Amino acid sequence: MFLTRTEYDRGVNTFSPEGRLFQVEYAIEAIKLGSTAIGVKTKEGVVLAVEKRITSPLLEPSSVEKIMEIDDHIGCAMSGLIADARTLVEHARVETQNHRFSYGEPMTVESTTQALCDLALRFGEGEEESMSRPFGVSLLIAGHDENGPSLYYTDPSGTFWQCNAKAIGSGSEGADSSLQEQFNKDITLQEAETIAVSILKQVMEEKVTPNNVDIAKVAPAYHLYTPQEVEAVISRL
């Protein structure tokens, strides 16, 4: 007996006759509604810049977390459902600490990304696994390890790619084309900050301020910029 399109729509583990997983495709589309995040890799380190959508003047801007630390040498920016991102980040944090405890060394950025994507591919852990959906979030993972700086991009299918520069979220199409024009492998970390924030300024629908933009760098340690440091970057535009 053939399943209807609606039944294929609901199932996360059932391929349609065309070889598609509709729930995963819908999750990827959901990310295009999220806030824009940009990552740029340089020889010195990696810069992450993210748009923070402050939906009400009553909202405390510092409570909107769009960039999170995974380990002291890895951070990630997100676009999509923040609760889903938090689940993935918590999983990655446990993996990196277990690795450090077991082997006495930090986990590589690629291995951390792989562990995170393994969970994304299972759509959850333990009891959650049977009643789950794809994670509706995409991540830019920035890190610095024995191989130098690296930037990875993940999507809800559990796939990841290594990038020199990448944008995700609602403004990703325009931001990606701007990155292609402005990026080169010899830029400095300071130039990468300026490029990332200037492109965010182009795609955002409001004025760029320390309240609606988060910036972080991994060079080689993770550092989330203070509002004063963000203001200093904005003043260079």
Swiss-Prot record:
Positions of post-translational N-acetylmethionine modification: M1
Pfam families the UniProt entry points to: Proteasome (PF00227), Proteasome_A_N (PF10584)
Primary site of residence: cytoplasm
Keyword Transmembrane among UniProt keywords: no
Covalent link (Glycyl lysine isopeptide (Lys-Gly) (interchain with G-Cter in ubiquitin)) residue numbers: K43, K66, K185
Protein location: Cytoplasm; Nucleus
PANTHER family registered for this protein in UniProt: PROTEASOME SUBUNIT ALPHA/BETA (PTHR11599)
Protein name, per record: Proteasome subunit alpha type-5-B
Species assigned in the record: Arabidopsis thaliana (Mouse-ear cress)
Gene of this entry: PAE2
